[in-house]
Amino acid sequence: MTPSPIRTATCACGSVELEAVGKPIVSAVCYCDDCQKGARQIQALPNAGPVADPDGGTEYILYRKDRFACTKGADLLKSYKLKQMSATNRVVATCCNSAMFVNFDRGPFWVTAYRARFHGDVPPLQLRICTKFKPAGTALPRDVPSAERYPPLLVLKLLAARVAMLIGR
């Protein structure tokens, strides 16, 4: 049985399409230094659209790796790293330089997709993380809980998703 819903994300020009199946692990905004640097790196590409919000945060939806796939245009995807030896890849659709998702060379069992790439019924934001790194003088909205680092709620959601993967749910 296929978990529902199925959400589709596309690059700005429509040449790359991603599919995420089932309930996401979490929908969050990250303010860490690496996400801010990564957003600037991608935004500096020719014709790239905005990646970070005006307050410096980057909105993501996290999905289990086993429920996330590129269904169109995989040959157009290119990884960008902040440092050559970094395990973190910010994946961009080269056709229009749209930020698509973040994955890792090793480690985490999840994929961090850029929330702005999704269409239709997009899950609402649930929390803001790593807010201690937000730009100086930035006032954050109080629409969802905020945490200076990685809150226990996020860690629990990640652990629950991993257990569900291990037992085949």
Where are these regions (language model features)?
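A short Gly-Trp-Pro
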Residues: 1-10, 16-169
